[in-house]
Amino acid sequence: MSVNVLLDTDILVYAYDTAVESKRRQALEILDTCAKNRQAVISSQVLGEFAFVVSRKLEYPIKGEQLMLTVDRLAKSFPVLPVNAFIVREAVRGMEQYQMSFWDAQIWATARLNQIGKILTEDVPGQAYIEGVRYINPFEDWTLHGQSHEGFYAIA
């Protein structure tokens, strides 16, 4: 299966957040399915944001050695795309042209410049499709592989 999805930080965080059990289960299923089918990537930005959020903002933070093991597990499960100067420049353009925050624009730029057509995120912008990149909220109805699906069950 080819890589066609960039996972945003919130999908990873929900998998480790016990505050909303229904989203946690969905996020775990998404990660499991994407890892098994090798259809998703993350970026170095996503991995860094994940480490920050789960170590500081969860009810039960992940710290120290456990956090390092968790980051390693994610990096082994999903290819990690680096953020480079081209991505930063494209993010600046996206930020200005589409009124996105810089960090959201950088996620978009990473997907766009790596020819990844979908971003799984709960934070879908006003435009759900920007220059070849479709935003999909996997906790609602969404489309993957050109077919409409309900929820996360049919990601493969």
Model regions and ranges:
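Short, structured helix-loop boundary elements
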Residues: R24, G64, M68, N84-A85, ...
